[in-house]
UniProtKB/Swiss-Prot annotation:
Gene coding for it: rpsK
Summary of the function given for this chain in its UniProt record: Located on the platform of the 30S subunit, it bridges several disparate RNA helices of the 16S rRNA. Forms part of the Shine-Dalgarno cleft in the 70S ribosome.
SUPFAM superfamilies: Translational machinery components (SSF53137)
Protein name (database record): Small ribosomal subunit protein uS11
NCBIfam families: PRK05309.1, uS11_bact
Cellular component, GO, one term: ribosome
Alphabetized GO MF terms: rRNA binding; structural constituent of ribosome
GO biological process per UniProt: translation
Keywords tagged on the record: Ribonucleoprotein, Ribosomal protein, RNA-binding, rRNA-binding
Family statement drawn from the similarity comment of this UniProt entry: Belongs to the universal ribosomal protein uS11 family.
Assembly: Part of the 30S ribosomal subunit. Interacts with proteins S7 and S18. Binds to IF-3.
Coiled coil: none
Length: 131
């Protein structure tokens, strides 16, 4: 029998960051939450699909709320107390995600910014669905 090489898991280094930026990307299929420091270095992230929501349940407001709570609990371990919010996309979890960041204890919201890209009549949109 060949021996298995067992590699040790990297230990997560706790950073002491007071301010962060919460990026909420709400698509029609999923909601991604990424928390960075002010320079843009990623501290932690969470997605609705990564929390066990599958299929159409990933795009629900409840799944977005759970993703925000998961990401903020990880960020609090790194000392994040004040955040700005950048929201992108037209998804259904967008408003709920913003509200749940604001209602989380120990985290103060400094500003909210919408960074959804809007075309100046660029690419042709996909054809209308016929169901």
């Amino acid at each position: 029998m060949a021996k298995r090489n067992v590699t040790a898991k990297k230990k997560v280094v706790k950073k002491n960051i007071a301010r962060g930026v919460v990026y909420i990307s709400a698509t029609f299929n999923n909601t991604n939450i990424t928390i960075t420091d002010e320079m843009g270095n990623v501290i932690c992230w969470s997605t609705a699909g990564g929390l066990g929501f599958k299929g159409s349940k990933k795009s629900t407001p409840y799944a977005a709320q759970q993703a925000v709570e998961s990401a903020l609990s990880k960020a609090k371990e790194h000392g994040v107390k004040e955040v700005g919010i950048k929201v992108q996309g037209p998804g259904s979890g967008r408003e709920t995600a913003i509200k749940s960041v604001g209602t989380t204890e120990g985290v103060k919201v400094l500003w909210i910014k919408d960074i959804t890209p809007l075309p100046h009549n660029g690419c042709r949109p996909p054809k209308r669905r016929r169901v």
